[in-house]
């Protein structure tokens, strides 16, 4: 049948699979959030109706469509529909400031913005240009609700299969106050992740619990394979430990992706051991350092496999630690996955011999097409070998042991990872030094039980009587939520 044949291809059509699952298992659950649930028939029909009107509005092949709001079913439908229509999904970071969001939107080149009421209010007064605004839920003013804006039932759209090089999505880097970097992922890159790398992990019976935002690549690493293989995904609007445990037990969740701070909150929750989590097949973790002690606790008390994924949104090398198979390697991030190559470079970009400590650098079939509109930034990430092959530098200092397991021992990049999000100290230092009372500033990451790391600023003042609280309030007012 079409689905089995398509999933066996080295490159296939993700959008066509969404429609095919609607025919293959029309009455099976596909999506759920806190207020509703959709079958695969309903998902296939709704995404077709959205795709049809996007094309009628003039959406060009590969053109971005921006999405901004709390993760829920309408958000997921738009994401899937954009891909089915031949567009490029551009989810925007909800924690960003209005100015940052405006910069992302402009950079994306989108002519449509799907948004919820709360984020639309945040954008009041922000110039977005000639854009069609559609509300993800209820209509606001002249902006129609998604349910009313969709094309008529049975509407058809041009479902020409994508090329492997066509853009699938743009993921905007978090934690920067300057021009955002839009990381472009191609259909070929995503297909390799969804149908290639995860072929043996996901199937039509998968039940995933999604508790991180849909604008994050962390989330897509589970959400997209679940959809590709015809499974079921419950989307949480906001992570809450007790609600997560309730959903996991009720839905008999099989797959999930969490960042370390979420694992910590779950494992320390007083009710954790009272829940039946025996349905779990695999739990993933990525985006931030995952303490060996926490991994051990998860292995001991939470049924199912535990897999740590190390890599960048930009791609390059991906390492996986199957912690349940290698309990003596919990201090590492695992080994490069099949088809991924890893080398180590010194500070001058010279290749180092095996066993050396240096900048982890990799290449694989899952590499970004580049940063949108920023070729110079793309080149800064790249390293070329003698044969002209492109490798991507992670910015992490690491070492590979005799068994091929990778340990992270530091960073070459000046970056703080807080709650799974990247924060660049230089950006914060520039804002602090722009304050009239500040002559010099330094920002460092401090250990945090709640977030892993949190940024702390140190300043030299022109006047000892200046108020640090006032400076802090002004600077935080210019930062996104995750940067404060």
Language-model segments: which ranges?
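Conserved AMP-binding A3 loop
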Residues: 39-41, 168-192
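Conserved structural elements of the adenylate-forming
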Residues: 44-49, 164, 183-204, 211, ...
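Conserved AMP-binding/adenylation subdomain of ANL enzymes
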Residues: 85, 191-207, 215-255, 269
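Conserved pre-ATP/AMP-binding loop-to-beta segment of ANL
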Residues: 9-11, 26, 153-172, 179, ...
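Gly/Ser/Thr-rich phosphate-binding loop
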Residues: 228, 253-258, 267-328, 341
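Conserved ATP/PPi-binding loop(s) of AMP-dependent carboxylate-activating enzymes
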Residues: 335-339, 350-383, 421-423
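Conserved AMP-binding/adenylate-forming
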Residues: 10, 36, 51-96, 422
């Amino acid at each position: 049948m079409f689905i089995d044949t398509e999933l066996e291809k080295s490159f296939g059509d993700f959008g066509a699979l969404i429609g095919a699952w609607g025919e293959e298992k029309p009455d099976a659950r596909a999506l759920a959030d806190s207020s509703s649930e959709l079958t695969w028939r309903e998902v296939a029909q709704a995404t077709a109706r959205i795709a049809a009107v996007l094309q009628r509005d003039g959406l060009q092949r590969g053109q971005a469509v921006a999405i901004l709001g709390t993760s829920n079913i309408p958000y997921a439908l738009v994401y899937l529909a954009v891909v089915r229509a031949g567009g490029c999904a551009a989810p925007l970071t909800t924690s960003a400031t209005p100015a940052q969001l405006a910069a992302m939107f402009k950079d994306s080149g989108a002519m449509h913005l799907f948004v919820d009421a709360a984020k639309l209010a945040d954008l009041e007064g922000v110039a977005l240009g000639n854009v069609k605004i559609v509300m993800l839920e209820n209509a606001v003013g002249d902006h129609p609700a998604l349910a009313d804006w969709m094309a008529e039932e049975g509407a058809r759209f041009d479902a020409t299969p994508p090329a492997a090089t066509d853009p699938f999505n743009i993921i905007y880097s978090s934690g920067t106050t300057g021009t955002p970097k839009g990381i472009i992922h191609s259909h070929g890159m995503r297909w390799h992740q969804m149908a290639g790398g995860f072929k043996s992990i996901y199937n039509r019976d998968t039940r995933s619990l999604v508790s991180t935002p849909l604008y994050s690549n962390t989330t897509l690493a589970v959400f997209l394979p679940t959809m590709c293989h015809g499974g079921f995904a419950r989307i949480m609007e906001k992570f809450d430990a007790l609600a997560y445990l309730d959903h996991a037990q009720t839905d008999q969740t099989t797959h999930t992706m969490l960042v370390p701070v979420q694992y910590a909150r779950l494992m320390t929750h007083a009710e954790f051991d009272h829940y039946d989590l025996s349905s779990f097949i695999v739990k993933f973790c990525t985006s931030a350092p995952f303490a060996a002690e926490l991994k051990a606790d998860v292995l001991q008390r939470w049924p199912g496999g535990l897999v740590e994924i190390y890599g960048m949104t930009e791609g390059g090398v991906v390492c996986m630690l199957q912690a349940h198979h290698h309990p003596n390697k919990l201090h590492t991030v695992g080994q490069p996955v099949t088809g991924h190559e890893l080398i180590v470079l010194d500070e001058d970009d010279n290749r180092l011999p095996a066993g050396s400590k240096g900048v982890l650098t990799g290449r694989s079939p899952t590499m970004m097409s580049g940063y949108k509109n920023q070729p110079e930034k793309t080149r800064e990430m790249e390293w070329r070998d003698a044969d002209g092959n492109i490798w991507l530098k992670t910015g992490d200092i690491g070492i590979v042991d005799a068994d091929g397991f990778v340990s992270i021992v530091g960073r070459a990049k000046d970056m703080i990872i807080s709650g799974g999000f990247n924060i660049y100290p230089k950006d914060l230092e520039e804002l602090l030094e722009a304050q009239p009372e500040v002559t010099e500033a330094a920002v460092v990451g401090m250990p945090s039980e709640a977030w892993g790391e949190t940024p702390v600023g140190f300043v030299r003042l022109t006047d000892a009587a200046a108020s640090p609280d006032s400076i802090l309030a002004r600077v935080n007012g210019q930062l996104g939520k995750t940067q404060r």
